[in-house]
């Protein structure tokens, strides 16, 4: 994916860039595979804000993506189109199966229009094919990996993401995640060969706040500049530090929220590297 940089004709254009969409072969989605996507604005059924910084944005239709592919084993499919999906960073591929059905999948890097792909234990190890981890050789780059057999892909689905299959031990496969974490996954789980395409998406410079509003992202305001009625850090004469340990607008302390005793922690072989753990 190529990135086009704008000339600084206006302050909003300066430093901004946009995708060239060279891989896209069709601009309108398959009508049978889209559903309405009503906007919530970050509110729940009571109208209370449960997720901040959401609201507005361009209208979207949700594309139904096949994250399982287990009911199409042994049925070849032709890549009809590579399409843009506003609901995710990766592009999507429209498949035409030989039995007449059409489905969307996440488009991996190198997948071409007209290419034939398939899924199942007898599928070849080539980009776009989906098969169980037990049938994939060690060292293969994969994406769209399941955490539980038959539950659908949960790992490595965003643009440019990939996982390396390091090896197999008993009933588990050992994976190196995009975060550098090494963890075990049931060997019956399925994965797609290759890495997710559209890797240059991370290099796009939005350039102005308005482009984020088009995406449905509202401004983020620090608590220390609010009034006391709006945030525990608000108020005070002049510029203050908040006067207490960092908390959310509802008083919950800042910090990690994952349960340290979560049942799946025993599947982690090696923790991901963080800034604190890196050698200086």
Curated annotation (Swiss-Prot):
Biased composition (Polar residues): 258-268
Residue stretches of biased makeup (Basic and acidic residues): 23-33
Highest taxon above the source species: Bacteria
Matches recorded under Pfam families: Ribosomal_L2 (PF00181), Ribosomal_L2_C (PF03947)
GO BP, sorted A to Z: cytoplasmic translation
Composition-biased stretches (Basic residues): 37-47, 270-280
Signal sequence segment: none
One cellular-component annotation, GO: large ribosomal subunit
Keywords: Ribonucleoprotein, Ribosomal protein, RNA-binding, rRNA-binding
Gene Ontology MF terms: rRNA binding; structural constituent of ribosome; transferase activity
UniProt keyword Ribosomal protein present: yes
Chain segments carrying region Disordered: 1-47, 224-280
InterPro entries: NA-bd_OB-fold, Rib_uL2_dom2, Ribosomal_uL2, Ribosomal_uL2_bac/org-type, Ribosomal_uL2_C, Ribosomal_uL2_CS, Ribosomal_uL2_dom3, Ribosomal_uL2_RNA-bd_dom
Positions in coiled-coil regions: none
Function: One of the primary rRNA binding proteins. Required for association of the 30S and 50S subunits to form the 70S ribosome, for tRNA binding and peptide bond formation. It has been suggested to have peptidyltransferase activity; this is somewhat controversial. Makes several contacts with the 16S rRNA in the 70S ribosome.
Complex formation: Part of the 50S ribosomal subunit. Forms a bridge to the 30S subunit in the 70S ribosome.
Family listed: Belongs to the universal ribosomal protein uL2 family.
Name of the protein: Large ribosomal subunit protein uL2
Species per Swiss-Prot/TrEMBL record: Corynebacterium diphtheriae (strain ATCC 700971 / NCTC 13129 / Biotype gravis)
Lineage per the UniProt record: Bacteria, Bacillati, Actinomycetota, Actinomycetes, Mycobacteriales
């Amino acid at each position: 994916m190529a990135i086009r940089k704008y000339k600084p004709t206006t302050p909003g254009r300066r430093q901004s860039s946009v995708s060239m969409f060279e891989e896209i072969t069709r601009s309108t989605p398959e009508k049978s595979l889209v559903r309405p996507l009503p906007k919530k604005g970050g509110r729940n059924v009571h109208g209370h804000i449960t997720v901040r910084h959401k609201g507005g944005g361009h209208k979207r239709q949700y594309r139904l993506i096949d994250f399982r592919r287990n009911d199409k084993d042994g049925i070849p499919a032709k890549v009809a189109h590579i399409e843009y999906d506003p609901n995710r960073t990766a592009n999507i591929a429209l498949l035409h199966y030989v039995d007449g059905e059409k489905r969307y999948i996440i488009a991996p890097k190198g997948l071409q229009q007209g290419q034939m792909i398939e899924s199942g234990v007898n599928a070849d190890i080539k980009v776009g094919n989906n098969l169980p981890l037990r049938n994939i050789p060690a060292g293969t780059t994969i994406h769209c990996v399941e955490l539980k057999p038959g539950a659908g892909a949960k790992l490595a689905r965003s643009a440019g993401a990939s996982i390396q299959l390091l090896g197999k031990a008993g009933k588990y496969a050992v994976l190196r995640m995009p975060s550098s974490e090494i963890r075990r996954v049931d060997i019956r789980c399925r994965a797609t060969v290759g890495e997710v395409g559209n890797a240059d998406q991370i290099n796009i410079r939005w350039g102005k706040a308005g482009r984020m509003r088009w995406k449905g992202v509202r401004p983020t305001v620090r608590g220390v500049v609010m009034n006391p009625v709006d945030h525990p850090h608000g108020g005070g004469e002049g510029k203050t530090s908040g006067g207490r340990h960092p908390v959310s607008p509802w008083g919950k302390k800042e910090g990690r929220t994952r349960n340290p005793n979560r049942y799946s922690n025993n599947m982690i072989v090696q923790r991901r590297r963080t800034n604190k753990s890196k050698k200086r």
